[in-house]
Amino acid sequence: MANKLFLVCAALALCFLLTNASIYRTVVEFEEDDATNPIGPKMRKCRKEFQKEQHLRACQQLMLQQARQGRSDEFDFEDDMENPQGQQQEQQLFQQCCNELRQEEPDCVCPTLKQAAKAVRLQGQHQPMQVRKIYQTAKHLPNVCDIPQVDVCPFNIPSFPSFY
């Protein structure tokens, strides 16, 4: 009798734990596995260089600025008549970012941009649309900067589940 009572209590406790655990949402971020990725060693080299040198500082600032301004999904520099000095600073930041990208090896442009976007994302609390804009900017920078051999970076832009 005691064994049956114990089994019933254990089964009820297990059901309660499973029900309670299913209430929570989890966002999981996957990193590419260097072992299964044929260009894994190159990616490791790019990542090490990015971490060692902290490359792409101007690009990180540009991504953050673009996200904060809340512009459309297109990457552009609109004429800001109210703040021409701000537009000039943004243009200088853009030129510095493009110069930083031109110094990268072509194979490392997209991986280092992805790392830079991730670093910007982790620097502060951003709304989902801001995070999307950070990655959108990073993805299209090679094209906008006219980087040889690179057009648009093939990495995915993070999506966030709807809670409504």
UniProtKB/Swiss-Prot annotation:
Q: What does this protein do?
A: This is a 2S seed storage protein.
Q: Does the keyword Signal apply?
A: yes
Which protein family is it in?
Answer: Belongs to the 2S seed storage albumins family.
The signal peptide stretch is: 1-21
The protein's gene is named AT2S1
UniProt entry tagged with the keyword Disulfide bond = yes
| UniProt keyword annotations, A-Z | Disulfide bond, Seed storage protein, Signal, Storage protein
Q: Which residues form the propeptide?
A: 22-37, 74-83, 163-164
> What more does the record tell us?
This is the most abundant isoform of 2S albumin in Arabidopsis.
Known SUPFAM superfamilies for this protein? Bifunctional inhibitor/lipid-transfer protein/seed storage 2S albumin
Q: How does it assemble?
A: The mature protein consists of a small and a large chain linked by disulfide bonds.
Q: What is this protein called?
A: 2S seed storage protein 1
PANTHER family in the record, alphabetically?
A: 2S SEED STORAGE PROTEIN 1-RELATED (PTHR35496:SF20)
A single GO molecular-function term is: nutrient reservoir activity
